Regions:
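Iron-sulfur cluster-binding electron-transfer modules in prokaryotic oxidoreductases
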Residues: 17, 30, 146-474
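Ferredoxin-type iron-sulfur electron-transfer modules in oxidoreductases and energy-metabolism complexes
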Residues: 2-39, 43-179, 297-303, 351, ...
Length: 474
């Protein structure tokens, strides 16, 4: 005899029943997570598909967009029932000071007592996200984990202290211009085994990249590249503006991969263009990834003002790194301070219009591994590299590939190192190894973090497509 009671079909609780208990304003504010319908497209086993790298690297459901959205909904329900404000975290200096006592208490004295609200479990799930935005581009209902991840991290760290690692990453764009004044000293420190061990064990960072050490002021002067300003741009005639381009610098290619920067200048100049470079301002992407949202909004406001003054001349603005450049189109547009940010083109979007055609037979084959954010969010733009190469008699193919496992600073965090390596071995590793075989086309990568990961994992430096194109105009 069984004592089990049969459940009525219409008596089984549904997800919608608990979702209705969440405050309507909260529901609408976190719509990208609330609208996850559980289709499971993110449970993708294909290693050569971009979504979702953390799921493929761990095979843990909490490390998938569906898992994170489900955890967030449950967390929001618990916060609603507890009367907590999840729409706005305390901000500003006063907010930081006011919450300091409670953050100290929660972090050191009563941390385990609050485990029932899922905060720590959700934090662990969010920490495993690469913020590659593949879900934002490929999920059928456009669940964007990086968006609600950043908001959660801001709220979480209004209750708990941040690790030093977060401040180091968030301040990178602001500190690197100063550090670049002493490249030899910086590189010596970052190469020292004791310093590396200290960074690993105490800060939680590994394999810090080294500065290029190029004297950019001298290089720009030698190439006759001016600093872009409204005055300099307005001084150009209408015809001169048609042959002018302004490069928007990002911290990574500017100081850590300067050869790509210089290659762009040379390519533009040799194809008859006048090149100017915008004054450097932090882009803010690392701040957004770590949940420093007030600081990100300030950075977006400053950068947007600069870009608007430069774009008023009608001269195209171009950014080299896909992940950093697409921030202007995506994260900036979602905050009031950057909602009217002008378009900054990816290099291939500008080159397909501006690069002169060379009448020559096919003189080489190449393969491009595109950045995850770029190929999942702007696939049409990514495909433009092929006609750009055709213009100069080169054949470019884009093999299907997954994620490289670096994703900005994700792969440089010690807690993510093993997952980062596992992701690389699934897709990029075999493709890179195959490219080293005789008669194989040269492999290229347009993402700075992707090139950094290949160098770290396989000991190879992949060239940027710009560097290949420059050879055709040497």
């Amino acid at each position: 005899k069984l004592d089990a009671e049969l459940l009525k079909v219409d008596g089984v609780p549904l997800r919608a029943d608990s979702d209705r208990m969440i405050n309507e304003r909260v529901w609408e504010s976190y719509g990208t997570a609330m609208h996850c319908n559980g289709n499971g497209a993110c449970y993708n086993f294909d290693p050569n598909d971009a979504m979702c790298p953390s799921w493929k690297g761990t095979r843990e459901r909490r490390h998938s967009p569906k898992g994170r959205a489900s955890l967030l909904r449950e967390w929001l329900l618990l916060q609603t029932q507890a009367g907590a404000d999840v729409l706005q975290a305390p901000r500003g200096v006063w907010g930081f000071v006011k919450t300091l006592p409670s953050r100290l208490k929660n972090s050191f004295l009563t941390r385990n007592e609050s485990a029932g609200d899922l905060s720590h479990e959700l934090y662990e799930a969010m920490s495993g996200c690469l913020s590659c935005k593949a879900c934002a581009g490929q999920c059928p209902v456009k669940v964007s984990v990086p968006d609600f991840r950043a908001r959660f991290l801001e709220l979480y760290h209004a209750r708990y202290l941040r690790p030093m690692r977060d401040y180091l990453i968030g301040s990178l764009e602001f500190s690197v211009p100063f550090l670049s004044r002493f490249p030899a000293v910086y590189n010596a420190l970052m190469s020292n085994s004791r310093i590396k061990e200290l960074l690993h064990s105490r800060i939680g960072m590994v394999d810090s990249p080294l500065l290029s050490g190029t004297d950019m002021e001298h290089a720009l002067k030698k190439l006759d590249v001016q600093i872009a300003s409204p005055k300099a741009l307005n001084a150009l005639s209408k015809e001169q503006r048609k042959r002018c381009v302004v490069l928007i610098p990002d911290a990574f290619t500017r100081w850590f991969d300067t050869s790509v920067w210089i290659a762009f200048f040379k390519l533009a100049i040799r194809t008859g263009h006048t090149v100017m470079v915008a004054p450097y301002l932090p882009n803010g992407k690392p701040l957004h990834v770590q949940g420093f949202l007030p600081a990100f909004e300030k950075a977006a406001a400053r950068q947007s003002v600069l870009l608007k003054t430069l774009s008023a001349s009608g001269v195209p603005l171009v950014g080299l790194d896909p992940a950093m450049t697409l921030v202007f189109r995506q994260e900036y547009r979602k905050v009031s301070s950057g909602s009217d940010c002008p378009e900054v083109m990816l290099p291939q979007e500008w080159l397909v219009q501006s690069l002169p055609k060379i009448d020559t037979a096919n003189q080489g084959q190449f393969q491009l591994l595109a950045h995850c954010t770029e190929k999942t969010n702007t696939p049409t733009s990514t495909a433009l590299w092929e006609p750009v190469f055709e213009k100069v008699g080169l054949q470019l193919n884009m093999p299907v590939s997954g994620c490289c496992g670096m994703a900005g600073t994700y792969g440089h965090e010690a807690r993510n190192m093993e997952t980062s390596k596992a992701i690389y071995r699934q897709s990029w590793g075999p493709l890179v190894e195959q490219s080293t075989q005789e008669q194989s086309p040269e492999l290229l990568a347009d993402g700075y973090s992707c090139r950094c990961q290949v160098d770290r994992m396989s000991g190879l430096r992949l060239r940027h497509p710009i560097e290949v194109l420059l050879e055709k105009f040497s």
